[in-house]
Regions:
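Short, flexible, basic/aromatic active-site loop/helix in glycosyltransferases
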Residues: 1-23
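Structural element of the ATP-grasp superfamily
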Residues: 38, 61, 109, 113, ...
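Aromatic-acidic/polar surface patches that form glycan- and anion
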Residues: 22-27, 31, 50-51, 98, ...
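Transmembrane helix-loop junctions in multipass membrane proteins, especially transporters and channels
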Residues: 5-13, 141, 145-152
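Active-site-adjacent helix/loop segment of glycosyltransferases
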Residues: 63-149
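Membrane-interface aromatic/basic loop that binds lipid-linked glycans or pyrophosphate carriers
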Residues: 144-186
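Short capping/connector residues at structural and topological boundaries
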Residues: 8, 28-31, 81
């Protein structure tokens, strides 16, 4: 954000607006789409089980015209917590790496990148996650040494992260082929 704002990178989502604001995607919790746009862009992709489906859909809708939020309208949306209760997770947000919920989030984001940007970007992202496991292992080890903690204390998280990345690798051939498949991992 500190880099994107000065170079006028479009914001993908805007938490609060007072006027009409153009965006790259809109949360599907409150989304209105014209019928003629739906006929051209299609409905939400059924390959997605949870997460990232509206981002991919908005990328197709955006090819038909602008996506905007209207600042003079409002809706009250309470944060959903059902998935956290089901998975016994206390995490808020969408940035974990270790749990089954995080695996579903990673899978959906990789699938979205494949559908939205193609095989090359999908593989680039997957290779970065794979490299990330090694980096996380080494940096975690060094950090725990410097802070005088057990240098192997983070290995449980390393293995959980690695397991999640490996699971995406097992589904990579299916994702690359881009054939219909329901990616439910929870």
């Amino acid at each position: 954000r500190w880099l994107g704002t000065p170079i006028k990178t479009p914001r993908p989502s805007v938490p609060l607006a007072s006027t009409i604001q153009e965006v790259d995607w809109i949360s599907a919790a409150f989304l209105l789409v014209k019928k003629r746009v739906l006929e051209k862009a299609g409905l939400m992709d059924e390959d997605f089980f949870l997460y990232a489906e509206e981002v991919e859909w908005c990328s197709r809708i955006g090819k038909q015209g602008k996506l905007c939020i209207y600042g003079d309208l409002s809706a009250i949306h309470l944060q959903g917590e059902a998935i956290n209760k089901d998975q016994q997770s206390n995490e808020k947000g969408y940035y974990g790496l270790y749990s089954r919920k995080d695996l579903q989030l990673m899978m959906s984001n990789h699938l979205r990148v494949r559908k939205q940007f193609g095989v090359g970007w999908f593989l680039f992202l997957l290779l970065n996650y794979t490299w990330g496991v090694l980096v996380y292992t080494i940096v975690g080890f060094i950090h725990r040494l410097i802070t005088l903690r057990n240098p192997f204390g983070h290995l449980g998280k390393v293995f959980a992260f690695g397991k999640n990345v490996f699971r995406i690798w097992t589904l990579a051939p299916t994702i690359v082929r881009n054939k219909p498949h329901f990616y439910k991992l929870l």
